[in-house]
Curated annotation (Swiss-Prot):
Molecular chaperone required for chloroplast biogenesis. Essential for chloroplast biogenesis and maintenance, and thus for embryogenesis. May be involved in the disassembly of VIPP1 for thylakoid membrane formation and/or maintenance. Cooperates with TIC components and other molecular chaperones to drive transport of preproteins into chloroplasts and functions in the chloroplast stroma to facilitate membrane translocation during protein import into the organelle. This is Heat shock protein 90-5, chloroplastic. The lineage of its organism: Eukaryota, Viridiplantae, Streptophyta, Embryophyta, Tracheophyta. It comes from Arabidopsis thaliana (Mouse-ear cress). Transmembrane segments: none annotated. SUPFAM superfamilies: ATPase domain of HSP90 chaperone/DNA topoisomerase II/histidine kinase (SSF55874), HSP90 C-terminal domain (SSF110942), Ribosomal protein S5 domain 2-like (SSF54211). Residues 1-60 form a transit peptide. HAMAP family: HSP90. Disruption phenotype: Embryonic lethality due to embryo development arrest at the heart stage.
Length: 780
């Protein structure tokens, strides 16, 4: 065997301590990150020696070459890994945790585990409780000395347990205890033990430059003190001899804060807030040292007036006195741990207000427990009011879902892992005993488990919303829809897998119900026998929808049309495509079928106006893709519709409003506009005569241009040049009203006066019907 190689890892301050001839004990200061045991060989070739020097344990690593082994590939020597302990601790402390403040969560969790262990063991050994007092945790910050002291009345530790638990990196005493509990099903059936990785204690060095642990186990008569400083590979253990520091039972941890962290973490209010955030639902009372004020009654001497004799009179008054005392920080109990049948509605509302700092009662709640691959308890709430900021609708990081593991807060910073973005308005708590977390307990590890949880949470949320929609009190769902309807519409776009759950919850105004919202189920129930589709129209307002020319024939035939008046509505409906085998049809697009067409009449109309359609298309050129006879108009002369795959007027308006709108796409999509004409309208009949009898007429051409421009506006589009359109209208108005009510041109009037015509003041009134002569060229 090769000679042993030795390397001392204890820090330089130890060299100044005189070495006393005390026995040196061999202890394996192991790390779960290093291979040891049967993986290499039974004999230990890399041992950690704890040399006791003046009660200080210094870490030494003796790395030895293993015996030569012969394998199929040939002979070779097997080595074991070595580690720089101070560097390893630095990596554990500063690389695992993203926030310094989690040190308090970890230490409180350790204290809770110690109390749980004592409670379990006392079932069979009641003597362990002794006179150690109530099971509790106390946290006392000291801003003057820059320290935080955390005391629990739990199981404590013996000297051997101190070395084993605090001297062994990644050695979890809780994990060992849980393993023992599993062997005893009666004791281990129900526990609240939290720790599992064996590194949480070292998070104290996130904020502390020195940590002192004083502990007293009911199994031992002696109390021991463990001390260590940051960036050191050694620690000290001594027996406590000062009677003022003797504990009846439990553990006291004192953190000597770093200079940069004293002002933040030695402040009492900060500590209280951290406890409320991370450890509010720990199963044992947590008291924090807080400054309080009280009003006391005192006696004061009344001032003696001049000339008066005798002793001054006493008068009673009050003053405010400040003092320090213990305050319970976790008074709110974990409501989700109780049976839902035993909890009153008022308790749910009160818990909601305290947990989420709300002032309104929630609109609804659901309390459930799931079992199977993942077991967890949860309470979900629908708030009484929606977000005031529209950005919250599209922001998945709303911190509304709080994840707990064994009632210890883990995180509320989820980027859509637990809840989809469109359900981000839901608030609630999720608590599990067996979630796969990373070592820092800040991130969920296993995506499969997360997917299962997400699926169940979504299903329960939809069940809760469905109950509101089916409630006898219709105002509840009306309130829900006003506040959160936009979120569900977003779900139509983002979650195709849940369309069947989302679609029945949608509500819209319609041509038959402009005051109350209607559901798609009600729409289908009211459909006629020949109606095969769900018709909708997207506009910018309810007023615009009601006056749109697209509706004319549908209203005449008593066909209901849904009004989509919010920007997200049209995209949401387009993503749904169908509901209960009924297609969604936009009535502002080409090829509209109403289900009761008269094919003979339609064919005759197309034949009669086929020449006019070609003539108008020739006049308009590339402005429209084609011109055709309409089956959707009854009172308007024409309407401009979009191509089947093009943007509607509403969508075009929204895309133009985008800050980074794609102009090339806009030009491509708008090129499929189609002008539809009403064959029964007088203007169209006149133009039909004009195209046959006077196709070169400039007046007819001007009418076509103006007809197209007005169709742009009435159909919801935006004209390219409003000023040019205005001039055309003014010109046509001048033609229509010029001289009609007695006005004459100034030149005409002046020439008449010069000629002395005494009839110049008389004006002949001509009726419009008399203007058209029998030989009008536009007549057939």
């Amino acid at each position: 065997m090769a000679p042993a190689l030795s390397r001392s890892l204890y820090t330089s301050p130890l060299t100044s301590v005189p070495i006393t001839p005390v026995s040196s004990r061999l202890s394996h200061l192991r790390s779960s990150f290093l291979p040891h045991g049967g993986a290499l060989r039974t004999g230990v070739s890399c041992s950690w020696n704890l040399e006791k020097r003046c009660n200080r344990f210094a870490v030494k690593c003796d790395a030895a070459v293993a015996e030569k082994e012969t394998t199929e590939e040939g002979s070779g020597e097997k080595f074991e890994y070595q580690a720089e302990v101070s560097r390893l601790l630095d990596l554990i402390v500063h690389s695992l945790y993203s926030h310094k403040e989690v040190f308090l969560r970890e230490l409180v969790s350790n204290a809770s585990d110690a109390l749980d262990k004592l409670r379990f063991l006392s079932v069979t050994e009641p003597s362990l409780l002794g006179d150690g007092g109530d099971l509790e945790i106390r946290i006392k910050p000291d801003p003057d000395n820059g320290t935080i002291t955390i005391t629990d009345t739990g199981i404590g530790m013996t000297k051997e347990e101190l070395i084993d638990c605090l001297g062994t990196i990644a050695q979890s005493g809780t994990s060992k205890f849980l393993k023992a509990l599993k062997e005893n099903k009666d004791l281990g059936a129900d526990n609240g033990l939290i720790g599992q990785f064996g590194v949480g204690f070292y998070s104290a060095f996130l904020v502390a430059e020195k940590v002192v642990v004083s502990t007293k186990s009911p199994k031992s008569d002696k109390q021991y003190v463990w001390e260590s400083v940051a960036d050191s590979s050694s620690y000290l253990i001594r027996e406590e001899t000062d009677p003022d520091n003797i504990l009846r039972r439990g553990t006291q941890i004192t953190l000597y804060l770093r200079e940069d962290d004293k002002y933040e973490f030695a402040e009492s209010t900060r500590i209280k807030n951290l406890v409320k955030n991370y450890s509010q639902f720990v199963g044992f009372p947590i008291y924090t040292w807080q400054e309080k004020s009280r009003t006391i009654e005192v006696e004061e001497d009344e001032p003696v007036k001049e000339g008066e004799e005798g002793e001054p009179k006493k008068k009673k008054t009050t003053k405010t006195e400040k003092y320090w005392d213990w305050e319970l920080a976790n008074e709110t109990k974990p409501l989700w741990m109780r049976n839902s049948k035993e909890v009153e509605k008022g308790e749910y509302n009160e818990f909601y207000k305290k947990a989420f700092n709300e002032f309104l009662d929630p609109l609804a709640h659901t309390h459930f427990t799931t079992e199977g691959e993942v077991e967890f308890r949860s309470i979900l709430y629908i708030p009484g009011m929606g977000p005031l900021n529209n950005e919250d609708v599209t922001n998945p990081k709303t911190k509304n879902i709080r994840l707990y593991v064994k009632r210890v807060f883990i995180s509320d910073d989820f980027d859509g892992e637990l809840f989809p973005r469109y359900l981000s308005f839901v608030k609630g708590v999720v608590d599990s005993d067996d979630l796969p977390l990373n070592v820092s307990r800040e991130i969920l590890q296993e995506s499969r488990i997360v997917r299962i949880m997400r699926k169940r949470l979504i299903r329960k949320t939809f069940d809760m919303i469905q109950e509101i929609s089916e409630s006898e009190n219709k105002e509840d769902y009306k309130k829900f829809w006003e506040n959160f309807g936009r979120f569900l519409k977003l779900g139509c776009i983002e979650d195709t897998g849940n369309h069947k759950r989302i679609t029945p919850l949608l509500r819209f105004f319609s041509s038959k119900n402009e005051e109350e919202l209607t559901s798609l189920d009600d729409y289908i129930e009211n459909m006629g026998e020949n109606q095969k589709a769900i018709y909708y129209l997207a506009t910018d307002s309810l007023k615009s929808a009601k006056s749109a020319p697209f509706l004319e024939k549908l209203i005449q035939k008593d066909i209901e049309v849904l009004y989509l008046v919010e920007p997200i509505d049209e995209v949401a409906i387009q993503n749904l495509q169908t509901y209960k085998e009924k297609k969604f049809v936009d009535i502002s697009k080409e090829d509209l079928e109403l289900g009761d067409e008269d094919e003979v009449k339609d064919r005759e109309a197309k034949q009669e106006f086929n020449l006019l359609c070609d003539w108008i298309k020739q006049q308009l050129g590339d402005k429209v893709a084609k011109v055709q006879v309409s089956n959707r108009l009854s009172s308007s002369p024409c309407v401009l519709v979009s191509g089947k795959f093009g943007w509607s007027a509403n969508m075009e308006r929204l895309m133009k409003a985008q800050a980074l709108g794609d102009t090339s796409s806009l030009e491509f999509m708008r090129g499929r506009r189609i002008l539809e004409i009403n064959p029964d309208h007088p203007i169209i009949k006149d133009l039909n005569a004009a195209c046959k009898n006077a196709p070169e007429s400039t007046e007819a051409t001007r009418v076509v241009d103006l007809l197209y421009d007005t169709a742009i506006i009435s159909s919801g589009f935006t004209p390219d040049s409003p000023a040019e359109l205005g001039n055309k209208i003014y010109e046509m108005m001048a033609m229509a009203v010029g001289g009609r009510w007695g006005r004459v041109e100034e030149e005409e009037e002046s020439s008449t006066v010069n000629e002395g015509d005494d009839k110049s003041g008389e004006t002949e009134v001509v009726e419009p019907s008399e203007v058209r002569a029998e030989s009008d060229p536009w007549q057939d």
